Curated annotation (Swiss-Prot):
The keyword Secreted applies. GO terms for cellular component: extracellular region. Residues 1-29 form the signal peptide. Residues 232-269, 349-362 have a biased composition (Polar residues). InterPro entries: HHLA1 (IPR037643). Residues 231-289, 340-362 are annotated as: Disordered. The keyword Signal applies. Keywords: Glycoprotein, Secreted, Signal. The lineage of its organism: Eukaryota, Metazoa, Chordata, Craniata, Vertebrata. This is HERV-H LTR-associating protein 1. It comes from the Eukaryota. Glycans are attached at residues 79, 143, 161. It comes from Homo sapiens (Human).
Length: 531
């Protein structure tokens, strides 16, 4: 029967048509599915690409138009301790060579749009014009003073006495160079300040120069460099950085740290005074590390940096000769060095302050991160002798580049080494703050303790405490900086009695200078008003 049906012409025609239709449907289905899959894969790509471009355009437009007032910038968030120590530990790991340059740049006048930290190994740096970068501050690191936890305060203090608000740090370029000399056990981290443009050709030779480590932070709101600054490490050469610095003279290696207690010394660092000012400003001790937004100093297992540093700052003199040479750096322990700029010239003279006498005015500089200030006067003390002049640094000496240093990430809590040194008597702060220790110890406030101590020791003990008080005031009592977060409120409430006791004591001990216009001393005035 089936054979009969298959032999009929009409049936053959129907079977042929059915096969053709079936084949056509199959081909159409395959093409349709392929087209559908292609559309499915293409659509998300197009949408995500458009969204990404749109997001970038909005970000660029925001950064181009937004102007944040300087007073809204929270400088307590500008604590680069963790970043700098991370870079140091990684750059120096398995290497005895030292990098030459740490550059901190920003090109925004009143808004904090971009903040870059780059580490360069410089060997082809041009001569730096002293007229553009006239001021130089140095910080001594050795086996007794190898800590960078006051790095933030150092940056702020450099700029702090030049403007009502700390906008200068955002429109100037601060360059840090690292120098080590055989004549001294110090590794000098020196900072030059000045104004420059974005053109690298002013300072660099034609050859391309790539940073060893480069971090760039961008800020959209007033959070600036707080907890959200987990910046992405970039390895490409920055095209908008102005690089000027002092070259290091010899490759130095990081000196090993001594036991924790051996780092309890403190020495002053220089302050630039205007020619009309006659008072000598003494700055000793360390900046505050109260735990609101300041980051703790994390330690690498191979390079432990003690956290109580001594400061020694030097001033250098620019010499113009056939070869530009950095003149000798005067390091003055326990005394103040003031460098004055000659009104008509670009040369900067270096001089040590005379020994302190009973009639000498000595003021402690307090590092206030955005908090207002007034100079404080300390009781005159015994004369101080200046140390001998250190050897000169010759411009142009080439520093060998360190071994391969990867861009560091922010260390987490698990990266802490076993050498994190805290004693049982020290009081930690509230979780989740970094583990910090107050620098206002109880023995400081015993009756007669300060009167019996020499001037330098008294200032050494008072100054770190005062800076902690300044930071507490900014974070807890300053209305514009007050944080609504629960942990911040708990911290402020719990430590207010500590603030009140220590602030009352310090305000009784010191005397404010009303005509002072420096940023760093305005904090004391507000603290004393609050108590």
């Amino acid at each position: 029967m089936l054979g009969f049906l298959s032999r009929g012409p009409s049936m053959k025609l129907c079977m042929g048509l059915a096969c053709v239709l079936s084949l056509w449907n199959t081909v159409s289905g395959i093409k349709g599915e392929a087209k559908k899959e292609k559309g499915m894969t293409f659509l998300p790509t197009t949408v995500s690409g458009l969204r990404e471009e749109e997001r970038k355009e909005k970000g660029v437009a925001f950064l181009a138009t937004t102007e944040l007032p300087a007073r809204s910038i929270d400088l307590s968030a500008l604590n680069l301790t963790e970043l700098v120590n991370g870079m140091l530990s990684r750059a120096l790991k398995d290497s005895k060579k030292f990098f030459s340059l740490l550059s901190v740049t920003s090109y925004s006048s009143f808004a904090f749009h971009k903040f870059s930290v780059a580490v360069y190994n410089i060997s082809n740096l041009k001569t730096v014009d002293p007229a553009k970068f006239p001021t130089r501050y140095c910080y001594c690191l050795n086996n007794r003073t190898n800590d960078l936890s006051d790095f933030t305060a150092l940056l702020v203090d450099i700029i702090g006495n030049s403007t009502s608000y700390l906008t200068e740090i955002f429109k100037s370029t601060s360059i840090l160079s690292v120098n080590q000399s055989n004549e001294s056990d110090c590794i000098f981290i020196c900072v030059m300040t000045g104004k420059s443009g974005r053109n690298l050709s002013d300072f660099w030779e034609i050859e391309e120069k790539y940073p060893i480590i480069n971090y760039t932070f961008t800020s959209g709101l007033s959070g600036v460099l707080g907890a959200a600054t987990r910046g992405t490490a970039r390895t490409s050469k920055p095209t908008t950085k102005s690089q000027k610095t002092l070259p290091s003279t010899s490759p130095g290696h990081w000196t090993q740290s001594t036991p924790w207690a051996s780092a309890l010394r403190s020495s002053p660092w220089t302050e630039t005074a205007a020619p009309s000012e006659t008072e000598e400003t003494l700055n000793t001790g360390r900046p505050p590390e109260l735990p609101a937004r300041a980051t703790a100093t994390w330690f690498s297992a191979s390079h432990t940096l003690p956290a109580l540093a001594t400061r020694r700052v030097a001033r250098t003199q620019w010499l113009t000769a056939d070869r530009q040479t950095w003149a000798s750096i005067s390091s003055v322990p326990w005394a103040q060095t003031i460098s004055e700029k000659k009104p008509g010239g670009s040369l900067w003279e270096t001089r040590s302050s005379p020994p302190t006498t009973a009639g000498t005015e000595e003021a402690m500089n307090t590092t206030s991160l955005l908090a207002p200030a007034a100079e404080i006067m300390a009781t005159p003390g015994s004369p101080s002798q200046a140390s001998p002049t250190l050897g000169a640094f010759t411009h142009g000496t080439q520093t060998p580049s360190p071994t391969k240093a990867t861009a560091p990430r922010y260390p987490q809590t698990g990266d802490l080494s076993a050498e994190w040194p805290f004693t049982a008597g020290e009081e930690p702060v509230l979780v989740p703050r970094p583990h910090q220790v107050s620098r206002c110890p109880q023995p400081l406030f015993k009756v007669g303790a300060m009167a019996a101590a020499p001037l330098t020791l008294a200032i050494q003990r008072l100054n770190p405490c005062l800076m902690e008080l300044c930071q507490f005031f900014q974070q807890c009592l300053c209305m514009s900086q007050r944080s609504p977060r629960t942990e911040d409120m708990r911290y402020c409430l719990e430590y207010y009695s500590w603030f009140l006791k220590n602030a009352t004591y310090i305000c009784q001990r010191v005397k404010r200078v009303s005509h002072s216009h420096t940023l760093k001393q305005k904090c004391l005035e507000n603290i004393c008003k609050s108590v």
